[in-house]
Amino acid sequence: MSNQDQALIFELSREGRIGYSLPELDVPEIELGDLLSDTYIRDEDAALPEVSELDIMRHYTALSKRNHGVDSGFYPLGSCTMKYNPKINEKIARIPGFAAIHPLQDEDTVQGALELLYDLSKHLEEITGMDEVTLQPAAGAHGEWTGLMMIRAYHEARGDFKRTKVIVPDSAHGTNPASATVAGFETVTVKSNEKGLVDLEDLKRAVNEETAALMLTNPNTLGLFEEQITEMAEIVHQAGGKLYYDGANLNAVLSKARPGDMGFDVVHLNLHKTFTGPHGGGGPGSGPVGVKQDLIPYLPKPVLVKKEGRFTFDYDRPHAIGRVKPYYGNFGINVRAYTYIRSMGPDGLKAVTENAVLNANYMMRKLAPYYDLPFDRHCKHEFVLSGKRQKKLGVRTLDIAKRLLDFGYHPPTIYFPLNVEECIMIEPTETESKETLDAFIDAMIQIAKEAEENPELVQEAPHTTIVKRMDETKAARHPVLRYEAEER
């Protein structure tokens, strides 16, 4: 069977085929019905595949070759920070004292693990300029919701129930308005100015006595630093609102600037992005939230504290928003982030930002002659191009992304942010070499030339992948999400 015709594991099944055998029974045989109630016993056997161990190994090895990850190739997905994840992280996370413990163990038996969590929170407080951090949230959007729920609790504790609106820029991550809605707020959008930054006059018009918070990413999703951030903080604070920092782009300012020093009251981080937890496959992640002093009472409980040299959880938090996750966060990702921070140190984290920004600006300048550059200025860790020039030739940004697959690259983020037509958002990260950047630049230049000379080649891409272009409308309206077993 060719790689193109890869069968489902169910289709490899043959009745009676097994992958292992059990030793002969040396204890009395007991019927399952004698142990379990009929409520828990199937009327019919589950339709599970019957395959050999070799079948399984070849099947999943073949599938793995269809995947693209940071370890297999360049992954310039904008606003996702697809950097290399050092393998020392995996080694430390697999230490039995970390990997083989359970959250229900007695605290005295896991003091080392609790110390790691406590120290990690202190490192994150220092990095962000916050006064206290919770590690409970499972990922970025979960962190957003947690931070917004704390802001809501803060206003309600003051009897300020009219603060029902959260302001977001038109360049915001899509999770920002979504998180605000789930947290019970209405969203108000403010526009960007000609420089790609928040329009201060529009912000002033939007802020009022109903404003609960302004959610902001800095640098923003255009890769541009909000230079007037202190003035923006003053506008929001004078109106009685809070300033929320979406930490998706923290990789651009590590050891260079701290959200707390810019005037932010709440910060969420993406440890799986900035601090090298493996991501891109759906989880797990880690989205810690840091707050300034006046929001500490509302942190999720329990709060990890150190008392008389011993680490313990404090449940006596009457104003806390409650738990936001069972137990204490995604521990394995936190171990990896802690390992990364300790191995890099302050100087190493500073170098991360410097190289991430350098790589992004290098690529931007190299590609600017071939694609439209909406904001022709110094960028931070990522930048956006526009495919408007190619669109006039009949080649869409989607076509460009599909054509990149033929060169072995994961495409950049496309059509986001929404305020840039035919947007192409590229984030190279700090871990890529100049040779890798140059090869990707050459591919992008070749595609731009193909759009002029042979647009059909780009329009019909990809040409070398196993799966070509799907019917995306049909996939969205009539998804096939599971295998339907045939009648036996």
UniProtKB/Swiss-Prot annotation:
GO cellular component terms, semicolon-separated = cytosol; glycine cleavage complex
UniProt lists the gene as: gcvPB
Q: How does it assemble?
A: The glycine cleavage system is composed of four proteins: P, T, L and H. In this organism, the P 'protein' is a heterodimer of two subunits.
- Give cofactor(s), names only: pyridoxal 5'-phosphate
Q: Which GO terms describe its biological process?
A: glycine decarboxylation via glycine cleavage system
* Family that this chain belongs to: Belongs to the GcvP family. C-terminal subunit subfamily.
**Entry EC no(s):** 1.4.4.2
Task: List the Pfam families hit by this protein, alphabetically.
Answer: GcvP2_C, GDC-P
What keywords are assigned to this protein? Oxidoreductase, Pyridoxal phosphate
Quote the protein name from its UniProt record.
Answer: Probable glycine dehydrogenase (decarboxylating) subunit 2
Give the protein's biological function.
The glycine cleavage system catalyzes the degradation of glycine. The P protein binds the alpha-amino group of glycine through its pyridoxal phosphate cofactor; CO(2) is released and the remaining methylamine moiety is then transferred to the lipoamide cofactor of the H protein.
Question: For this protein, what reaction is catalysed?
Answer: N(6)-[(R)-lipoyl]-L-lysyl-[glycine-cleavage complex H protein] + glycine + H(+) = N(6)-[(R)-S(8)-aminomethyldihydrolipoyl]-L-lysyl-[glycine-cleavage complex H protein] + CO2
N6-(pyridoxal phosphate)lysine found at: 273
Which species does the entry assign this protein to?
Answer: Bacillus subtilis (strain 168)
Q: Does the keyword Zinc-finger apply?
A: no
Q: Which InterPro entries match?
A: GcvPB, GDC-P_C, GDC-P_N, GDC_P, PyrdxlP-dep_Trfase, PyrdxlP-dep_Trfase_major, PyrdxlP-dep_Trfase_small
Coiled-coil positions are none
One GO MF annotation is:
pyridoxal phosphate binding
